[in-house]
């Protein structure tokens, strides 16, 4: 065995033995190593706090954020709704807003290729679909276009687009806008959609009975048939009334009806109505409105004249208008009948013309008043009162207050003539005796003026004395009588006095007859002894009787005073000859202040 060379002999070699020894050693040590690894699994040493608390807070914060995000997703349906919570936040945007694609009017959806679009009408089940406040029959093929119209985002925009497609002109160019549906107007422009020809023909007869002028056209389009009407009703109507009446007459949906007043000051609009009325397919009834004639007819254009101030002054004089605001308002109302008033409205100096007109009317009226005697003035006031009455309430009132009628007539006779020392009548007594009611009615009938001591601080408070036939000083107090005793003794006498008028030099006039009401008995107060001989006093003792309705039993109007002066003309020394212009030789031709034309014969 020893002779064999190492590594060449049979049996176990040295390599095998060495591997076997290594294998045996490792197998013996494996149990010990496994137990050691298990023992090292548990750390029995003292542990420190570390960052566990910070980790806990981070986890709680993340969980809270997740819950809040879930709530936001639950209660906010879209990002746009979230922006509505904060208008300022919604206004802030980094990316530009995308424009929504504009939809075409009555746009037909594209066919998918399977023929479903062609069978849409036949496959639709019968029923009604509510759009807004109106129910539309879906099964009706003619109403599908109306349904598409009502489902649009802007109904009026679609209606206007269809109108322009049919007539080639914008609806807004022919009409003006009324903000309120309650505003009334006789002229209306009406556009109706999806109407049948038999309904249009039947409505013509009905419109002739309720309208003075009718203009009707109908034109078909790819979307619907559009009917255009311009009507003038016999009375003014509001938009609500017109829409309700037209929808009932044409069996149309209110949402498919446009009603607006026409543009009456637009020449292109007037030319459109005038030219369209001559088409063969247009139905017209009645005479065209004046706003169409005025802007289209050559004769009407030639009749346009310049504004004449004298004609305006004559109109105000004939109607007894002296106040500027009243002149402006009443003259503007006659613009539809008077070309001169229409020219005044077109003028840029309306306010100046009104002031000039009022000034001239006051001048003419004042000169006319001064040219008449008191008797003529009283008869003029009687002639201009159309109603007839009786003077019984006046006599009963004086008798109830203890005033003798004969004494009152004698004092009034001297008062009307302005005799010195008898130019002022004073009515005094306790309150509620009817002093102001009685004297105010007389001043109103004689068209006198009222002066108030409240304006005594002004230099012009007595200016009405120069512009009236009679004046009234109502409710004179102690301060008033002191002022009269100091400064107005000459006025009480009925003598001439100087009055300071505004924008004029002091004017010398004779003080007109004056009425005074007061609660002070001037005759019993020696303080005003110099006024005792200048006034005629009537004591009213009893309170004015009141009926169950709270009104005074005695009423005094213009017709009562007219009967008073007519019945008592002889005791008052009112001459009938002075009252009748024909008897006293005066001319009966009315006053004329208009400029004469070139064709007037001299």
UniProtKB/Swiss-Prot annotation:
Phosphoserine modification, residue list: 78, 86
One annotated GO biological process: DNA replication
Family: Belongs to the papillomaviridae E1 protein family.
Cellular compartments per GO CC: host cell nucleus
Enzyme class: isomerase
Segments carrying motif Nuclear localization signal: 72-74
Full protein name: Replication protein E1
GO molecular function: ATP binding; ATP hydrolysis activity; DNA binding; DNA helicase activity
Region feature (DNA-binding region): 138-304
Organism for this UniProt entry: Mastomys natalensis papillomavirus (isolate African multimammate rat)
Chain residue numbers at which the record places covalent cross-link Glycyl lysine isopeptide (Lys-Gly) (interchain with G-Cter in SUMO): 510
Subcellular location: Host nucleus
Pfam families in the cross-refs: PPV_E1_C (PF00519), PPV_E1_DBD (PF20450), PPV_E1_N (PF00524)
The protein's assembly and partners: Can form hexamers. Interacts with E2 protein; this interaction increases E1 DNA binding specificity. Interacts with host DNA polymerase subunit POLA2. Interacts with host single stranded DNA-binding protein RPA1. Interacts with host TOP1; this interaction stimulates the enzymatic activity of TOP1.
Superkingdom classification of source: Viruses
UniProt keyword Signal present: no
Parts of the chain that traverse the membrane: none
Motif residue range(s): Nuclear export signal: 85-94
Protein's job: ATP-dependent DNA 3'-5' helicase required for initiation of viral DNA replication. It forms a complex with the viral E2 protein. The E1-E2 complex binds to the replication origin which contains binding sites for both proteins. During the initial step, a dimer of E1 interacts with a dimer of protein E2 leading to a complex that binds the viral origin of replication with high specificity. Then, a second dimer of E1 displaces the E2 dimer in an ATP-dependent manner to form the E1 tetramer.
Record: residues binding ATP: 429-436
Enzymatic reactions: Couples ATP hydrolysis with the unwinding of duplex DNA by translocating in the 3'-5' direction; ATP + H2O = ADP + phosphate + H(+)
Enzyme Commission number, as recorded: 5.6.2.4
